[in-house]
Structures are given as structure tokens and as C-alpha cells.
Swiss-Prot record:
Cysteine pairings via disulfide bonds: none
Its membrane topology: Multi-pass membrane protein
The organism of origin for this protein: Escherichia coli (strain K12)
GO cellular component: cell envelope Sec protein transport complex; membrane; plasma membrane
Summary of the knockout phenotype: Essential; deletion experiments lead to loss of the SecYEG translocation channel. Leads to loss of translocation of lipoproteins Lpp and BRP and accumulation of signal peptidase I (lepB) in a soluble fraction.
Chain ranges passing through the membrane: 20-32, 49-60, 98-115
Region forming the signal peptide: none
Location in or out of the cell: Cell inner membrane
HAMAP family: SecE (MF_00422)
Protein name: Protein translocase subunit SecE
Family: Belongs to the SecE/SEC61-gamma family.
Amino acid sequence: MSANTEAQGSGRGLEAMKWVVVVALLLVAIVGNYLYRDIMLPLRALAVVILIAAAGGVALLTTKGKATVAFAREARTEVRKVIWPTRQETLHTTLIVAAVTAVMSLILWGLDGILVRLVSFITGLRF
């Protein structure tokens, strides 16, 4: 039983160490980009991209990173199961939404005009 808890403790320590490495890599990317601003921009950008990719790679090796990858795979599987609308259905729905929006805007414009005239009649102010 104690061997199992020791294994869990070292596993947690390893996880924490991985996250420390991730944060360190990101800090090196940020601080290095700031400190070496006299170096050519494409070279600095390449270094930042490499450091961020390395940080992402280390993050994917953690427990949360593996869970994120599993979630992404499941999400991709679910996206494949979706029955997407055809081009014609999408066009018809878009046209209906545009028409309803136009009608509602005209109704609201008319109501606004009526309310402005009503308020100006009551208050005696002319706009």
C-alpha cells in the first residue's frame, strides 16, 4: 500500500515538473523575445514558435494534456457523425433569416417613428 502511494507521489512530482518546464519555456520565449529585440524579427519569431511548440509538446505529455488529446479525438469523431446541411438548405435558411431581419427592422423603424411623434406631441418639442 505504501509503495502505491509513493508511486503516486512521484507521479505528481513528475507532473508538477512537466508544468514547471512548460511555464519556463513560455517565459523564456517571452523574455527572450524582449531581451533580444535587436536580432532580426523572423529569427526571433522562429525561436518563439519553436519554444511554444516545445512547451505544447511537454504539456501534451502531462495527464491533463493526454485528457485534452482524448477529448479532441472524441470531438472529431462526433463532428464526423453530424449530418451537415446541403448548400441549398443553407442558402434558403440564410435568405429566410435575412428577410425576417429586414421585416423586423422595418417594423421597429415604424414603431420608433410613431413613438418619436407621440413624445414630441406630448412634450411640445419638435424634432
